[in-house]
């Protein structure tokens, strides 16, 4: 089985982007490639064609491989619901919510599941590119590991270790990993890659030689800072803490409050990339700007908990004042639920049973009951000819008089969402409404904005090709291919 696992010296070192870029690179060379991540922790999820869910990063990597995503590409997905607990999704289906300690007891069975999914992918591919999680150097997590070295040994996959030079101390990170790993794990690593370098690469030649001397691992190259990676979805909310702003020429101001369990925030990437917008994620403790044109309440993994969090920031007061001034408000999924009169969880789906008043901007009520809805959707925005495509991923049913004025009309006749009588507040369950150019233009037209044309998916595809070309020039691809067994 030809394969390579990309592990990192920490979280957010660029593993997901490098795997996506390498997927596209080897696909462009004519290989059948499949992405794989044994265990992911993220509230950014994607719906597969068979109605399952996987990490959004693996869905992107499937795009890079020019193949539909499947649940086997990310067989274990952890979706945090609290600081110590998460919803566990196995091969696309929710199996329950577990505290961190209780989850440890599941790992032996889950390791077998991940290896089986990996082998199913390998059977249909020339190459499987595997992404680790966090860092193998977190040796306190080594026992029972299924995300990094535990999986690599069980599936017999060679490893390349990534160091992020943009953070600094990359020599210490790689040499330190070599120091703390046991002999078998060190031997599993067949080389290292420096990532996110800015400037003249020759300035770090001595640093790379020192890493080789201290670790004995071969140098597989140094990838530059990839500006085009900004067109790709971020996997973790930590990326939102470093917003990239490009002011100048933007007119409409759009803000998205960063809820504590914010989910699927990558759906706003088309807005972040639109030069006609002043778009930002609003950090906790920051008031909603008085000159905001549109406030978007995003999806969340825990609606009731984040409704409490929203009020703790004072955002409820700000949003209601914004609406009274004639500002526009849009709610997506959990954000849509918050805009209604009440949210109830009688069976404790998200935690302890309970209910809370919503913001009352839409005449609807939500009850968190029933099976999770996971499906791709398409249709038109009500009152326009603009077509949209997206996906639903939620628990709960929303009903009320406001639903008589739906926001979306699905192909086939059903409807979704609600719109206020004055048309300034709207919400729906569907994620991905800004992806298609015509839907984005229709949604932003009331703000007086001529949105950038074109589907965001085409921009992502072009970015993947650009990243692949850069990696072809900057990494030792022939050595990487030999290690992988291609």
From Swiss-Prot:
A GO MF label: ABC-type vitamin B12 transporter activity
Keyword Glycoprotein belongs to the record: no
GO biological process: cobalamin biosynthetic process
Annotated InterPro entries: Class_I_gatase-like, CobQ/CobB/MinD/ParA_Nub-bd_dom, CobQ_GATase1, CobQ_N, CobQ_synth, GATase_3, P-loop_NTPase
Pfam families in alphabetical order: CbiA, GATase_3
Pathway(s) served: Cofactor biosynthesis; adenosylcobalamin biosynthesis
Family (UniProt): Belongs to the CobB/CobQ family. CobQ subfamily.
HAMAP family linked: CobQ (MF_00028)
Protein name as annotated: Cobyric acid synthase
Species per Swiss-Prot/TrEMBL record: Caulobacter sp. (strain K31)
